[in-house]
Structure formats: C-alpha cells, structure tokens
Amino acid sequence: MSRGFYIGRFQPYHNGHQSVLERIARTADEIVIGVGSAQVSHTVANPFTAGERVLMLTRSLEDLDCPFYVIPIEDVQRNALWVAHVRSMTPPFDTVYSSNPLVMQLFAEAGVDVQSPDMYERLTHSGTVIRQRMLGGEPWEHLVPPAVVDVIREIHGVERLQRIAGSD
C-alpha cells in the first residue's frame, strides 16, 4: 500500500490544492494531508483556524476516490527537527508531494521519496491572491471549491479578515 503526504497552510484551501490532491489520488492508495502552521490563526496571512481548514478540506474532498487523513501540524522552529516532528504526528507515508523547496529539501535529506506536482494556475490560485481579493471586495469564490465558499460564509471569514486587516 502506498501512502502519500501533502502539506500546506490552506489559507484558504483552493482549486490549486484540489487539483494536486486529485492527481495524487490517482497514484496513492491513501493520502495524509498536513495542515501546516496549525497554531496560527486570526492574522492577515493566516486568518483561519486549523479546525476551519480541516473542515474546508474534509468537505471539499468528500468525493475523492482515495481515503485521506487531515492532520493539523504545528510549526517547530528548528528545520532540522521538522521531518521527525511531522512523522510523529502522521501515519507513515512513502512519498511526499510538494513544490516548496524547503519541504522538498528536508524530506529528501531524510531519505523520503519527494515528488513535485505541477502547480495549477499558480498566479491566480494562491492563498495570498485569494485573501487580497477578499480584502478588496473582489470576487474570490471561483478560485476555491464550493465547500470552501460555504465554510468561509458560515464562519464569516471575509468579515474576520477585513476586521483583522483594519478595513471595512
């Protein structure tokens, strides 16, 4: 059985993440999804809690044809220990899927197979762009799965982000 690992902050979870996970599901028997920086929320760069991000992922992936686990992972401030920390928080996995150079380097140094999936429309499908659109009152809903729109509305996420940023 092969188990893949994919980590992100998911602030918010968007169509680019969805595309990558759908591709991973075609090759892995199971997927472990790490919600990174789980301890951070209520900032402009990280407005959503780990629990809210777990909800976004779980609802968006209901129809994924691959079993998955969504696991919040808090940051450690020592990169040399990070892989061991991740491994202590997750089921065992064979392959890491990431385009983040640091994540790729750390897992490669630990002897883990690392695959770099093609990014999906990276210029428009990024958490930074989506949060900027929310702050500017621009349409953002088309950049995330419908379940994420529902979660963000349910938690009044746009209003939270605007209050945190000091705008209305």
Curated annotation (Swiss-Prot):
It catalyses: beta-nicotinamide D-ribonucleotide + ATP + H(+) = diphosphate + NAD(+). GO terms for biological process: NAD biosynthetic process. Pfam families: CTP_transf_like. Its main location: cytoplasm. One of its GO terms (molecular function) is nicotinamide-nucleotide adenylyltransferase activity. Its EC number is 2.7.7.1. This is Nicotinamide-nucleotide adenylyltransferase.
